[in-house]
């Protein structure tokens, strides 16, 4: 709340007259906007760390209330077991950060639709603060602001910790790390500090409709243009972009850690923007084979062997992955399908479905595990996809149900497991086709616009126990740590 400043023409005399000792400006409390992570010293909180958020409002309006929200919801594994059978989360308890207990897992949202919102205290004029306990992980957050004139702003990214962006596209939230990888499934997400790190950048290529589109490129530590590398192609979900996997998805950190610890082989990782194609799978696949792969194979020294390249994705990116698997199973040695599936063709008539390895995941309270499309012609669920594989007696897959929801906690763990435990394991060499297929979609929509991403994350409409929920989950970067 803004206050009027009164000017004292004789402040020293007034101070002496009232018997008050003036405090030098250098000794006054200062507040640094952003997030500060520290070890937890409050015995009433069970989490190992605390995160203190400080927001300084610079808007001309008078801020009266500020809160912070993000991936600060938690669940008990023993209380969510019914979801796998029913897809109903209406009666599953969700806990806030102050209620956190060891053994709980983080979720990006409340299954009942009301995300935890943490009110902040105004500690100085237009400066707001709150401290919450948190276990180790990577978290996303944003501020919600109410003004005295009745107006408000929601999901405001932290101006002191902006999300990394590429030409206007970003992960939609601010991001920070807590701890040192102590949380199961998130052991490899933190940045390395020993210099054994690769690089990532964003480049432009010519897409199938003639427009310039972006790619994210991760190169491993010590990248050598004269050395041949394996490749991992990775797709975001609905409303996302090429930036997300490189930031909230922590792909560079995961790859750095797994490579440095000799838990995987060196590989180049390529992210893309499939939102631009409005999830027209024919166009996406056409663009992949005729534009993205040729660009990568021209500009980087990568193997063209089928068993040296993989494709994976989350949610609608997983639907892209399963579509690609069912239409071109002989073009990649490995597919990672995280939280979603699509069955666009009669798979019983597709050859070579037993050729690649599949790693399939979903969260234990994931909308894509089982929802109202299960066992229907429009089934998009993980459960439905696995059932279809079983009807064909296919055994070249592994299914894992992970602790989490339809969110980045599950997807980071999925990518980690995919790279660490499932890639580059095939001993039998698959003969590489003489040339990659040229797929021509039916009358592709013309466009001369470059990519724009007004939304980020994975925006899906779903019905859960009769409640209509819109979920948008994503993130952004770290600030300070004191241990």
Question: Where are these predicted regions, by residue range?
Answer:
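C-terminal low-complexity, Ser/Thr- and acidic/Pro-rich disordered "stalk" regions positioned immediately N-terminal
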Residues: 428-456
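Primarily recognizes the serine-hydrolase "nucleophile elbow" in alpha/beta-hydrolase
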Residues: 298, 304-354
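Aromatic-rich carbohydrate-binding modules that target alpha-glucans
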Residues: 46, 50-137, 146-179
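A cross-kingdom C-terminal cell-surface attachment/processing module
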Residues: 460-481
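A short loop-to-beta-strand scaffold at the N-terminal edge of the catalytic core in hydrolase folds
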Residues: 209-222
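Alpha/beta-hydrolase active-site loop
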Residues: 278-301
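Short substrate-entry loop that stabilizes the transition state in hydrolases
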Residues: 223-279
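C-terminal catalytic histidine-bearing segment of alpha/beta-hydrolase fold enzymes
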Residues: 361, 367, 379-433
């Amino acid at each position: 709340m803004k206050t009027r400043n009164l000017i004292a023409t004789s402040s020293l005399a007034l101070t002496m007259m009232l018997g008050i000792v003036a405090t030098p400006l250098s000794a006054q409390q200062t507040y640094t906007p952003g997030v500060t992570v520290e070890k937890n010293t409050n015995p009433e909180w069970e989490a190992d760390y605390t995160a203190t958020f400080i927001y300084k409002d610079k808007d001309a309006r008078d801020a009266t209330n500020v809160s912070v929200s993000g991936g600060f919801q938690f669940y008990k594994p023993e209380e969510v077991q019914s979801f796998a059978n029913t897809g109903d989360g209406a009666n599953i308890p969700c806990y806030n950060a102050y209620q956190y207990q060891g053994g709980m897992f983080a979720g990006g949202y409340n299954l009942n639709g009301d995300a935890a919102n943490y009110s902040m205290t105004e500690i100085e004029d237009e400066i707001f603060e709150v401290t919450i306990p948190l276990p180790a992980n990577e978290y996303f957050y944003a501020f919600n602001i109410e003004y005295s004139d009745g107006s408000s702003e929601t999901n405001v990214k932290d101006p002191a910790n902006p999300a990394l962006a590429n030409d206007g596209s970003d992960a939609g939230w601010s991001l920070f790390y807590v701890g040192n990888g102590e949380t199961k499934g998130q052991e490899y997400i933190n940045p390395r500090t020993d210099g054994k790190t690769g690089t990532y950048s964003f480049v432009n290529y010519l897409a199938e409709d003639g427009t310039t589109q972006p790619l994210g490129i991760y190169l491993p530590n010590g990248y050598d243009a004269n050395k041949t590398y394996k490749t991992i192609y990775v797709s975001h979900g609905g409303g996302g972009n090429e930036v997300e996997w490189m930031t909230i998805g922590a792909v560079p950190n995961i790859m750095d850690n797994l490579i440095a610890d000799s838990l995987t082989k060196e590989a180049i990782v390529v992210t893309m923007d499939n939102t631009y194609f409005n999830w027209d799978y024919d166009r996406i696949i056409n663009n992949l084979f005729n534009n993205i792969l040729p660009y990568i194979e021209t500009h980087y020294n990568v193997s063209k062997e089928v068993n040296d390249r993989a494709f994976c994705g989350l949610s609608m990116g997983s639907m892209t992955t399963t579509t690609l698997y069912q239409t071109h199973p002989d073009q990649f040695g490995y597919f990672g399908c995280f939280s979603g599936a699509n069955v666009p063709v009669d798979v019983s008539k597709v050859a070579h479905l037993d050729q690649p390895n599949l790693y399939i995941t979903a969260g234990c309270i994931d909308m894509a595990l089982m929802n109202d499309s299960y066992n229907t012609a429009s089934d998009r669920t993980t459960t439905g996809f696995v059932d279809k594989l079983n009807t064909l007696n296919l055994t070249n897959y592994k299914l894992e149900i992970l602790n989490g929801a339809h969110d980045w906690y599950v997807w980071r763990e999925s990518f980690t497991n995919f790279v660490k435990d499932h890639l580059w394991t095939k001993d039998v060499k698959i003969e590489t086709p003489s040339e990659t297929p040229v797929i021509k979609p039916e009358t592709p929509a013309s466009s001369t616009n470059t990519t724009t991403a007004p939304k980020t994350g994975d925006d899906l409409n779903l019905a859960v126990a009769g409640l209509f929920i819109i979920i948008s989950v994503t993130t952004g970067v770290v600030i300070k740590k004191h241990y």
